[in-house]
Amino acid sequence: MMSVNKKILDRLVVGLVGGAHAEAWWNSPNRAFDMKTPNELMTEETWTEVRDYLMHHAYGGGS
């Protein structure tokens, strides 16, 4: 299930940071996630935090 969710969310990541930087985004600590990587949050319980973050920024949300 999580690989399906990540595959869907990866489309947003590529749209936001570009294909060349997508993997780095997934593996870099992020202040929005208390310095955890987005990959660390791709669990059944917390993957929606990553989804919500990406959707917010995809629709032009600020910081």
Feature-to-residue mapping (PLM):
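Non-transmembrane "mature" sequence context
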Residues: 1-63
